[in-house]
Amino acid sequence: MSKEVSEEPEHVRPKDYTDPPPAPLFDVGELRLWSFYRALIAEFIATLLFLYITVATVIGYKVQSSADQCGGVGTLGIAWAFGGMIFILVYCTAGISGGHINPAVTFGLLLARKVSVIRAVMYIVAQCLGGIVGVGIVKGIMKHQYNANGGGANMVASGYSTGTALGAEIIGTFVLVYTVFSATDPKRNARDSHVPVLAPLPIGFAVFMVHLATIPITGTGINPARSIGAAVIYNQKKAWDDHWIFWAGPFIGALAAAAYHQYILRAAAIKALGSFRSNPSN
């Protein structure tokens, strides 16, 4: 007698994470919540502190005239100041506002339906105001040095074209926003939730690396709040000549990163899972 062999179908392991539902495009109900205004305050203060520390570092470095190699922090130190502050501030504010601290990041998350239009617009306003106030404090503390050393404003460096500067801003912001999406992915969060620094750390390190690459080209914008804060307070023609680059570049970079992560990486993973389930040989 032949014995029938019946194989039980393999069970696909359930997901150990949950994708959050898309944020509504217009959520007027947010305007009635204290948590919404608390998040705006957090974004304002975080961007203020970010611009105060980083622009003060830039001005302090430029003031140094000593021949001693240890007389100033140098490009490496400036990059650490920007990356380190993002690490600290994202860590401090992630649970309150999401720790955007950058209109380009907010724009990318809006495109991915992580935040509503109302929240995105209000975040960007709060970030820009925070940037202006932060740079204003720097000018108030070190006015002579501030005016004499370019005010920490983003400008296209001599020897570089507008197109090169725009490309640097697009690629730099792509790196940052792509890192934000990857570090805050629900799947990653579910498995790394016991290590709370794992999201802020790569985001801060991405900012550090981008600054190393692009400080010689544009002074590194990748954050329109940083750029407009310095431009408004410095308020010289050369700070405004190519200012559009520091809005267009970051927003294009954020758009590209959002599309890449949401519609290529995440969509590819969903498609692969569907193919696996529908294949009878698996």
UniProtKB/Swiss-Prot annotation:
Pfam families linked? MIP
Q: How does it sit in the membrane?
A: Multi-pass membrane protein
Which species is listed as the source?
A: Oryza sativa subsp. japonica
Domain of life where this protein originates: Eukaryota
| Main subcellular localisation | membrane
What PROSITE patterns is this protein classified in? MIP
Question: Where are the bilayer-spanning segments?
Answer: 39-59, 76-96, 121-141, 163-183, 197-217, 245-265
User: Which terms in the GO cellular component ontology are assigned?
Assistant: plasma membrane
Where is the motif (NPA 1)?
Answer: 102-104
Residue ranges for motif NPA 2?
223-225
* Tissue/organ expression: Expressed in roots and leaves.
Q: Summarize the record's induction comment.
A: Down-regulated by chilling.
Membership in a protein family: Belongs to the MIP/aquaporin (TC 1.A.8) family. PIP (TC 1.A.8.11) subfamily.
Q: Which residues form a coiled coil?
A: none
What is this protein's record name?
Answer: Probable aquaporin PIP2-6
Instruction: Read off the domain note.
Output: Aquaporins contain two tandem repeats each containing three membrane-spanning domains and a pore-forming loop with the signature motif Asn-Pro-Ala (NPA).
Q: Which keywords fit this entry according to its UniProt record?
A: Cell membrane, Membrane, Repeat, Transmembrane, Transmembrane helix, Transport
Q: Record's PANTHER family?
A: AQUAPORIN OR AQUAGLYCEROPORIN RELATED (PTHR45687)
Fetch the InterPro entries from UniProt: Aquaporin-like, Aquaporin_transptr, MIP, MIP_CS
Q: Name one GO molecular function term.
A: water channel activity
Cellular localisation: Cell membrane
Reported function: Aquaporins facilitate the transport of water and small neutral solutes across cell membranes.
Q: What is the lineage of its organism?
A: Eukaryota, Viridiplantae, Streptophyta, Embryophyta, Tracheophyta
